[in-house]
């Protein structure tokens, strides 16, 4: 009876693994579809670059604007973009681990010297479990978010810098390079000093009304658009990471199925051989 029991156990494991591989394959296909849609949103890049050029040119003559001036840093803000779901490999852990050591290094400092803004349930859970100061969060965003979906948190984030809640703001997210490569990115968002350093005036425009009045409206909107752009980038990375993770899981499941099938065939062959041996032995005993 033992060989039969062993055969049943192996068969049960094969069936269970097949069901798992079907699930991971379906998730891989869904993520592939979502990634294809997310990649189409990359067409906004030329528009963003043109806006960036205009803002840089406008700001070049008005560097005294509060959003363009570095000030003594008493408090630093971290905007961390994660996902609402797991099963995406190291997508989330790579981002939060980049931020967490910074908090650890500043562990002796008062908590009010650090402020964390989180997009995504995974990051929110991570930071709250470690009693880190999360002052703003948003979860349950759609897989293809529109600007309206994050307009409120983007506006509040820029407003927190403007009213002095923190003196500088860094963004952390996964930058989409390709379907098989995503890079964890740290980018200083506010003040826009790095942005000014990267962009030099190349075209001369005439403004009506004044540049200062335009910047009062344009700079906050531009900072909000940078947050939205990072979110789109992160979403594409999330779908790519999940697609890759599910493909690897499916491949591993298929390897396990092949190994178990080989074990099943060997066990079945051994059981048949044993039965034949017992029959032959019984026949010889009767002679």
Curated annotation (Swiss-Prot):
Gene3D superfamilies: 3.40.1380.10, ATP synthase, gamma subunit, helix hairpin domain. One of its GO terms (molecular function) is proton-transporting ATP synthase activity, rotational mechanism. InterPro entries: ATP_synth_F1_ATPase_gsu, ATP_synth_F1_gsu. Its main location: membrane. Keywords: ATP synthesis, Cell membrane, CF(1), Hydrogen ion transport, Ion transport, Membrane, Transport. It is a peripheral membrane protein. Coiled coil: none annotated. GO terms for biological process: proton motive force-driven plasma membrane ATP synthesis. GO terms for cellular component: plasma membrane; proton-transporting ATP synthase complex. It is found in: Cell membrane. F-type ATPases have 2 components, CF(1) - the catalytic core - and CF(0) - the membrane proton channel. CF(1) has five subunits: alpha(3), beta(3), gamma(1), delta(1), epsilon(1). CF(0) has three main subunits: a, b and c. Produces ATP from ADP in the presence of a proton gradient across the membrane. The gamma chain is believed to be important in regulating ATPase activity and the flow of protons through the CF(0) complex. Belongs to the ATPase gamma chain family. This is ATP synthase gamma chain. It comes from Bacillus caldotenax. The gene is atpG.
């Amino acid at each position: 009876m033992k060989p039969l029991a062993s055969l049943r156990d192996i068969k049960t494991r094969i069936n269970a693994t097949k069901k798992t591989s079907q699930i991971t394959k379906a998730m891989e296909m869904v993520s592939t579809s979502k990634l294809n849609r997310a990649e189409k949103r990359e067409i906004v890049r030329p528009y963003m670059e043109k806006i960036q050029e205009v803002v840089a040119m406008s700001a070049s003559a008005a560097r005294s604007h509060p959003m363009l001036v570095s000030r003594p840093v008493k408090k630093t803000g971290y905007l961390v973009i994660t996902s609402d779901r797991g099963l995406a490999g190291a997508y989330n852990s790579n981002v939060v681990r980049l931020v967490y050591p910074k908090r650890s290094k500043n562990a002796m400092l008062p908590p009010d010297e650090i402020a964390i803004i989180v997009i995504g349930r995974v990051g929110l859970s991570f930071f709250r479990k470690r009693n880190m100061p999360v002052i703003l969060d948003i979860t349950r965003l759609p897989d293809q978010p529109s600007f309206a979906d994050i307009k409120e948190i983007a506006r509040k984030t820029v407003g927190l810098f403007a009213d002095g809640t923190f003196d500088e703001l860094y963004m952390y997210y996964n930058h989409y390079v390709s379907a098989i490569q995503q890079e964890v990115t740290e980018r200083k968002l506010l003040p826009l000093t790095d942005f000014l350093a990267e962009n030099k005036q190349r075209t001369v425009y005439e403004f009506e009304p004044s540049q200062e009045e335009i910047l009062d409206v344009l700079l906050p909107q531009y900072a909000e658009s940078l947050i939205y752009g990072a979110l789109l980038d992160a979403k594409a990375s999330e779908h790519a990471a999940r697609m890759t993770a599910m493909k690897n899981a499916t491949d591993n499941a298929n390897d396990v199925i092949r190994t178990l099938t080989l074990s099943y065939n060997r066990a079945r062959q051994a059981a048949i051989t044993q039965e034949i041996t017992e029959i032959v032995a019984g026949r010889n005993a009767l002679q």
